[in-house]
A protein has these predicted regions:
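A structural detector for beta-sheet-dominated domains
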Residues: 129-131
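Extracytoplasmic/secreted cell-surface and envelope-processing proteins
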Residues: 38-40, 69-71, 105-108
Length: 134
């Protein structure tokens, strides 16, 4: 009888663990350009918004060749920057891609958008370790 109870307990524990939801971090790919005046005007408010979500997102910046190919950060990494921009068919900056599926103009990203993403859960947990200071 004890073995049956123990087995039942273990099975229920495993089943409940399978239904657990892992925290979902917001993954953002931010397409911007150092020579882009609109980017220079919108990026500061975007970064200010992100301070409220510290520890809840992963952010990657990509510098495509437009609107200006003279962008220093594009020039430093032409191949990878171009590949990312082409993959998402990015044709203007600043643009934000969230979770690789939702492409938005940076001006349309606000607390409501980020809160909606944070309210989602994931059945799978992936551990990401960030290095660096920015």
């Amino acid at each position: 009888m004890k073995r049956i109870l123990l087995l039942s307990f273990l099975i229920s524990l495993i089943a409940s663990d399978m239904n657990a939801q892992a925290k979902r971090y917001i993954f953002m790919e931010h397409f911007t350009n150092t020579y882009c005046g609109i980017c220079g005007a919108r990026n500061p408010s975007f970064y200010s918004l992100l301070t409220k979500y510290e520890g809840n997102y992963h952010h990657m910046t990509v510098h495509p060749s437009f609107p200006y190919t003279a962008c220093t950060l594009y020039q430093a990494n032409k191949t990878e920057n171009s590949l990312r921009a082409n993959y998402y068919a990015i044709n203007s900056t600043p643009t934000l891609v969230i979770h690789g599926t939702s492409k938005k103009s940076l001006s349309s990203v606000n607390a409501a958008v980020l809160d909606a993403e944070l309210n989602k859960t994931s059945p799978v947990q992936v551990v990401v370790k960030e290095t660096g200071s920015s």
